[in-house]
Each structure stands twice: as structure tokens, then as C-alpha cells.
Regions:
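Glycine-rich cofactor/substrate-binding loops
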Residues: 32-67, 128-129, 310-491
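Short linear loop/turn motifs
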Residues: 88-91, 256-261, 417-421, 456-459
Length: 491
């Protein structure tokens, strides 16, 4: 039945002269026999539909083919298959990849998965030689390889997107390093800062996000291929040869672990969740700042929407969607944790659920970054409104207390005296800047005329010289550190 003159082989020879889409049905029927030998009944349609994963794992076609090319090269080099057959397989796979990418070959949605489709196409083109590709390999270690290769590429893409956002933040921070606005705690005006300082807070968060992504990739960059289904293989394979071809730093130390864990997916989803936390917080502030209650910024028309009934509306929909989509990524992380928490070693079909979750997390983060970065880049900063807001709310009260500390008064006493002054101002409708000096001196005789310079907003910001603070010079240093970090970043 399995000889060179079998019905299957006759069909394959015939199919070589036909367009790819014509041979799909028969070819996938052939590949369905990969695991059918033990079974006496045909697969129910419901089972086939429920079991299939090609509709979401087909995005890994390039990684699947590239991994198979490396595997075939190794099989030939190690004498496990004839070198001439290895070369034919590699050439055939290369042609399949080119045909898919040119649009000449469509991935069959009726295939069980991308691995089955690729091997089926190869066998249709090469006959018996194509069937040798899967020697010393299981779909268990094959899919573990494909996911790692795919996610390494996606990490690089997301890191590049974050770097683009960081470049925009550094540019905006440089432009606004002297623009004063209120800093908030509990959403109450607290102390004066600069808009550049505020932007660099998010830059610091995103730098840590980049660090985490690099760290995830480092642990992910271990080759699982060669683990077999779970117990390795009896063939004299060279795993490190494959690792070198595919740019992996090492090979998995344990074959059970190599095929049965998806902690690298969970780690990536966790890192991406933190990216979304930071984007969501930033989005929340953008949404507030755009409102008439703040009016600190205005988004470009190209990154805003209107209302179907209220003609005056200009809505920050991108920021709102980023804030909302954070929940999707958190949900993807929860999905992965739930899938993996209760399955015994080694591979279980539950693990097929890993791909939709991690791919959704990846795609969502990329989509958000692609919209968020140009929104920030084109955003107009309403500097006068920021300054006007900083003039209210007694945000220079701490500086007033520090003035008394500089005169020798203990901080707690200085704090109490300043609190009394603020209470007076509230009762009389004044600010600390407009409160007469005699009222200052009635509370504490250490006050003198120079207190007005001390509590001037520009002075308040300029004298906050501690490392990481809001003064323009400090913001300059923060920008320089981020730029140096980006220059050295490994991805």
C-alpha cells in the first residue's frame, strides 16, 4: 500500500502538472492519513472543524517552512536521509514559500493545520521524498519551534514600535521642557512640574517595557526542535546545528519541557499587558486633557472623531480605544494562564489555545502603538492653559514651607504655618502670590519679601534640581538617558 506505485503516489505524480488550487482537496485527504492508520472510522465533520487550527496558525507559514528547511538540512548532514533528498526537500520548501508569498499558492482553509498543509504540498510536489521530511520530528516540537520563531519576530516588531513612540516622547519633551503645568496626586493639583517631565515619566515606563521584552526574548530563544513528541528521538540528530541555522542561543535541556510548556507565551503576554497598562494610563490623561475641563492639549483632526448628533464634538476615540483594548490583552494573559495551569506533562491539545490568545495580544499591542504614536506626535500642546491651571490650587505651598525650613524652622512647624496661610487665602479668595506680606508675618515672622520669589512657579520648577526632577536641565538629562538606552538596546 505504501510503495511507489500506490494510488496516492499516482495521484501525486499527476498533480504536479496541475494548478495548486486543483490539487488541494486530494492532497489534504492524503495528509489526513498522517495519524489515521490506527483508526477505523472517518473523522466526523464536527470533530474536524473543532480540531482544525489552520485558520489561526497559518500566519506561521514562513516560520514553519524555514524551520523545516533547517531540519531537512540537518537530516542530510547527519546521514539520516540521503543528502540529495535533503537538498530536494529544501528546494521544494523554498519554492512553496515563494509561491505562498507571491500569491501563486493559497493556504488551504480545509487543512488541519499549517504543518499538515506544508508537508502535504511538499509531498504533492516531491512524492516519496517529501514524506521523509518529518523524520526525527513530531508536530509537538515542530509547533513549539514555530511559535518561538514567530514570537521572536513579533517581539522585534513591537520593540521597534515602542522605540518609535519613545522617539516622539523625547522630541515632545524637548519642545516642552519648560512648559509648566500642575502635577497631580489623587487627581488633585499637587506641585508644579513641566510637561516635558510628565512625558518622560511615560518614557521611563516604556524603557522598562523594552527591557522586559528583551528579557522575554532571551528566555524564548531556546530551540525545542529535537524534543520529538516528548521523549527525544533515536536518530543521531544534531540539534545545535539546527539552532545555529535558526539563530537560537541554545537547545532545550529537557525534551518533556521543550514540547509541553508555554511559559514564554505567558511571559510575553504579561510584558504586553504592562505595555497596555502604560498606554492605557497615558490614554486616560489624554482623554482628560482634551476635555474643556482641562483643555491642556488638542488632538489633530486626523486622530479624532465627531458625533452623529452633536456637531460641536471632537472625541478622542483613539485614546479611548487604546484604554479599552487593554482589557483584551489582560484577557489573553488570563487565557494562557488558565490553559496551562492544570495540564499534565507533556503535550495536550489544550495547548492549541495558546496561539489565538498570544497572537491577539501581539496584534492588539501593535495596532494600539501604530495609532497612538502619531496621535501623540501631532498633538497640540496648549501651553497657556497648562500655565493657567498651575496658577491655581496652591501648588506652590510646599515651596512656601521649604522657604521657612531654609530660614531654620523645622519642617513640621513650617508645614503647619503654610497650611494656615492656605486656609486664609481660601477664605479671602486670594492666592499665596497675592496674600500681603503682613499676613505672612502674622503667622510666622521669618517670612520676608523674598518669599514671593521663592513661590513663583518658574522658581518652584527651576529649583527642583534633584536627579529625575522636573527642572528643564533634569528633563534634558532624562532625554539623554533614554536616547542612550535606545542606542544600546539589543533588539
Amino acid at each position: 500500500m505504501y510503495g511507489t506505485h500506490s494510488q496516492n503516489t499516482k495521484f501525486i505524480s499527476l498533480s504536479l502538472s496541475l494548478p495548486a488550487h486543483i490539487v488541494f482537496y486530494r492532497k489534504q485527504e492524503i495528509m489526513a492519513q498522517l495519524w489515521k492508520g490506527r483508526f477505523k472510522k472517518e473523522l466526523a465533520k464536527e470533530t474536524n472543524d473543532f480540531n482544525a487550527s489552520v485558520h489561526f496558525d497559518s500566519r506561521m507559514y514562513k516560520e514553519d517552512i524555514t524551520g523545516s528547511m533547517a531540519h531537512a538540512t540537518m537530516l542530510g548532514a547527519c546521514g539520516i536521509i540521503e543528502k540529495s533528498e535533503s537538498e530536494k526537500i529544501v528546494q521544494g520548501l523554498s519554492e512553496i514559500l515563494a509561491d505562498i508569498e507571491s500569491g501563486k499558492l493559497a493556504i488551504d482553509p480545509g487543512a488541519e493545520d499549517i504543518h499538515t498543509f506544508v508537508e502535504g504540498e511538499l509531498t504533492a510536489r516531491l512524492g516519496q521524498t517529501g514524506k521523509r521530511l518529518h523524520t526525527a520530528r513530531s508536530r509537538n516540537d515542530q509547533v513549539a519551534l514555530d511559535i518561538r520563531m514567530t514570537l521572536k519576530k513579533e517581539i522585534d516588531a513591537i520593540a521597534a514600535d515602542i522605540k518609535d513612540l519613545l522617539a516622539v516622547l523625547c522630541k515632545k519633551a524637548e519642545e516642552n521642557k519648560g512648559v509648566i503645568l500642575p502635577g497631580y496626586t489623587h487627581l488633585q493639583r499637587a506641585q508644579p512640574i513641566t510637561f516635558g517631565h510628565h512625558l518622560m515619566a511615560y518614557a521611563a515606563m516604556l524603557c522598562r517595557d523594552l527591557d522586559r521584552l528583551a528579557d522575554v526574548k532571551k528566555r524564548m530563544n531556546v530551540l525545542p526542535l529535537g524534543s520529538g513528541a516528548l521523549a527525544g528521538t533515536t536518530y543521531p540528530i544534531d540539534r545545535r546545528m539546527v539552532a545555529a541555522q535558526l539563530d537560537f542561543d541554545d537547545v532545550s535541556a529537557n525534551s518533556l519541557d521543550g514540547v509541553s510548556d508555554r511559559d514564554f507565551c505567558i511571559e510575553l503576554a504579561a510584558a504586553l499587558s504592562l505595555v497596555m497598562v502604560h498606554l492605557s494610563r497615558f490614554s486616560e490623561e489624554i482623554i482628560m486633557w482634551c476635555s474643556w475641563e482641562f483643555k491642556f492639549v488638542e488632538l489633530d483632526d486626523a486622530f479624532s472623531t465627531g458625533s452623529s448628533i452633536m456637531p460641536q464634538k471632537k472625541n478622542p476615540d483613539i485614546a479611548e480605544l487604546v484604554r479599552g483594548k487593554s482589557g483584551r490583552v489582560f484577557g489573553d494573559l488570563t487565557t494562557l494562564l488558565t490553559v496551562m495551569k492544570g495540564i499534565a506533562l507533556a503535550y495536550n491539545k489544550d495547548m492549541q489555545e495558546d496561539k489565538e490568545a498570544i497572537f491577539d495580544a501581539v496584534d492588539t499591542v501593535k495596532m494600539c502603538l501604530h495609532a497612538f504614536t502619531p496621535m501623540i506626535d501631532t498633538m497640540t500642546v496648549l501651553k497657556d492653559n497648562m500655565r493657567a491651571a498651575a496658577a491655581k490650587g496652591f501648588i506652590n505651598a510646599t515651596d512656601c514651607a521649604d522657604y521657612l525650613v531654609g530660614k531654620g524652622l523645622p519642617f513640621r512647624d513650617a508645614y503647619k504655618a503654610t497650611g494656615e496661610l492656605v486656609a486664609q487665602c481660601i477664605d479671602r479668595g486670594l492666592t499665596l502670590e497675592t496674600l500681603p506680606l503682613e499676613d505672612y508675618r502674622a503667622v510666622c515672622d521669618l517670612f520676608d519679601q523674598d518669599v514671593y520669589h521663592k513661590i513663583n512657579l518658574d522658581t518652584c520648577v527651576a529649583t527642583r534640581i534633584s536627579e529625575g526632577g522636573p527642572c528643564p536641565e533634569s528633563v534634558e538629562r532624562q532625554i539623554g538617558k533614554v536616547q542612550a538606552f535606545l542606542d544600546k538596546y539589543p533588539l
